[in-house]
C-alpha cells in the first residue's frame, strides 16, 4: 500500500484516495495503528472535500479505535459518522454505528445513556436491532431495573424469535425474574430455554440455576433431578461440579445423605468430588506447552490427561479443545477429527460450533461427504454467528 502512495503523485486525487485504500488494507490486516495513521494523512489532503470516501473514513477511523478498546476516542467519531448519515438512516452502517456508540457508553458504565441509544437502534428495526435490544436489557439490569430488563428482553424473543441472541435473552429473563423473587416464573423460563436451546452456551448455567431455584423453593425432588441432569449432561464443566455441591446440600437438607453417597458411587470414572492436585498438575503442564506453541508435547500431555481423568475431570472440555487444535496444527488430521468429534458431543460447551466446523471441513477434504454433511447440519443448528451460519448453509 505504501508503494502505491509513493507513486501516486499525479493527479493529487489518486494520492488522496490511495491513503484511504491503504487504511482499508491495514484495517483488514487488523493493523489498527497503521489504519489510523493512513486516515490522518488522508484527512490532511487539501482536496479532501472532493473525496467520496470522507464519510466512510469516519466509520473506519472509529472502528479502528474501537477495536483497540479506545472507547472514549471512538464514541465521538461514531457520532460524527451518524450525524453525516442522518439523511440515510436506512443504511445498515448507520444502525451499526449507533450500536457501537451504545457499546462505548456501556463500557464507560453510562448505562442509562447506553440504554437510550440501544433503544434508538431497536426502533429502526434494522440489522443489529436484536443485538441492541439484548444490550438494552443488560443495561437495564445493571441499573437494577429488573422488571424493565425482563420486559425488554421478552420483546426481543417476540420480535426476533430466530435471533442468535434469543437464548441469551431467555437466560437473562430468568435471572431478572429471580432478582424479583419470581422463582416459579424463573423455573418456567429455565425449562423453556433447556427445551428449546439444549445446545446453547447458556444451557449448562440454566440447568444448574434451575436446580438452585428448585432448592430455594424447597422442591427438593425436582432439585435433585435437575442437579443430576446437570452432572450427567455437562460432565467436566464448572457447572457440573457446582451441581454436585448443590446436590450434596439438598440431600443433607432433606436428610437423605445415604442416597447421595450411593449416587456418587455410580459416577465411576467421573471424579466429581474435587479437582485433585494430580488432575490440575497434569492439565496445567500440558496447557502450558499448548500456549507456548509446542504442539507435539501439548498433544501428548493433553491426551494423557484425557485418558486418565475424563470424562469427569475438571478440565476435560478445554483439554479436548486444546488437544484437537494441537493435532490440527501438527496436520495429524485423523487425531484432530477424533478430538473435535468428541468435543462436539460435550453438550453446551463454548467450542461446539468450531468443533462441528472443523470436523465438517476435514471430512469434506477427505471426501467423506456423509460425515461432512452431518457436521455441517449440526453446525447450522448451533451456529452463533451469521458468518458461520452461512458457511454451514453452503457447506
Model-predicted regions and their roles:
Residues 1-395:
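Acidic, polar-rich low-complexity tracts and alpha-helical solenoid repeat scaffolds
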Amino acid at each position: 500500500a505504501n508503494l502505491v502512495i509513493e507513486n501516486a503523485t499525479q493527479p493529487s486525487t489518486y494520492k488522496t484516495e490511495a491513503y484511504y485504500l491503504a487504511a482499508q488494507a491495514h484495517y483488514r490486516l487488523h493493523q489498527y495503528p497503521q489504519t489510523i495513521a493512513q486516515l490522518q494523512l488522508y484527512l490532511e489532503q487539501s482536496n479532501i472535500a472532493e473525496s467520496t470516501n470522507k464519510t466512510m473514513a469516519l466509520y473506519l477511523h472509529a472502528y479502528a479505535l474501537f477495536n483497540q478498546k479506545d472507547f472514549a476516542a471512538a464514541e465521538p467519531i461514531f457520532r460524527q459518522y451518524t450525524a453525516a448519515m442522518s439523511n440515510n438512516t436506512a443504511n445498515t452502517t448507520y444502525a451499526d454505528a449507533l450500536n457501537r456508540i451504545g457499546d462505548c457508553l456501556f463500557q464507560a458504565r453510562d448505562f442509562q445513556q447506553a440504554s437510550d441509544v440501544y433503544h434508538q437502534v431497536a426502533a429502526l428495526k434494522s440489522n443489529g436491532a436484536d443485538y441492541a435490544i439484548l444490550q438494552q436489557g443488560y443495561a437495564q439490569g445493571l441499573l437494577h431495573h429488573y422488571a424493565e430488563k425482563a420486559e425488554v428482553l421478552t420483546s426481543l424473543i417476540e420480535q426476533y424469535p430466530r435471533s442468535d441472541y434469543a437464548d441469551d435473552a431467555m437466560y437473562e429473563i430468568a435471572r431478572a425474574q429471580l432478582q424479583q423473587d419470581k422463582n416459579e416464573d424463573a423455573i418456567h423460563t429455565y425449562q423453556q430455554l433447556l427445551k428449546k436451546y439444549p445446545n446453547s452456551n447458556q444451557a449448562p448455567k440454566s440447568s444448574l440455576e434451575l436446580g438452585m431455584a428448585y432448592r430455594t423453593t424447597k422442591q427438593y425432588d425436582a432439585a435433585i433431578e435437575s442437579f443430576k441432569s446437570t452432572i450427567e449432561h455437562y460432565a467436566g464443566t464448572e457447572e457440573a461440579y457446582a451441581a454436585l455441591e448443590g446436590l450434596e446440600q439438598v440431600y443433607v437438607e432433606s436428610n437423605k445423605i445415604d442416597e447421595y453417597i450411593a449416587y456418587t458411587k455410580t459416577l465411576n470414572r467421573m471424579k466429581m468430588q474435587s479437582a485433585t492436585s494430580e488432575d490440575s498438575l497434569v492439565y496445567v503442564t500440558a496447557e502450558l506447552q499448548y500456549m507456548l506453541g509446542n504442539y507435539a508435547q501439548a498433544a501428548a500431555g493433553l491426551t494423557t490427561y484425557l485418558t486418565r481423568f475424563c470424562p469427569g475431570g475438571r478440565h476435560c472440555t478445554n483439554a479436548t479443545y486444546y488437544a484437537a487444535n494441537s493435532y490440527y496444527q501438527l496436520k495429524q488430521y485423523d487425531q484432530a477429527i477424533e478430538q473435535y468429534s468428541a468435543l462436539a458431543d460435550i453438550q453446551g460447551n463454548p467450542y461446539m460450533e468450531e468443533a462441528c466446523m472443523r470436523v465438517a471441513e476435514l471430512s469434506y477434504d477427505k471426501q467423506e461427504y456423509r460425515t461432512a454433511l452431518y457436521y455441517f447440519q449440526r453446525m447450522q443448528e448451533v451456529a452463533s454467528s451469521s458468518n458461520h451460519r452461512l458457511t454451514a448453509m453452503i457447506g
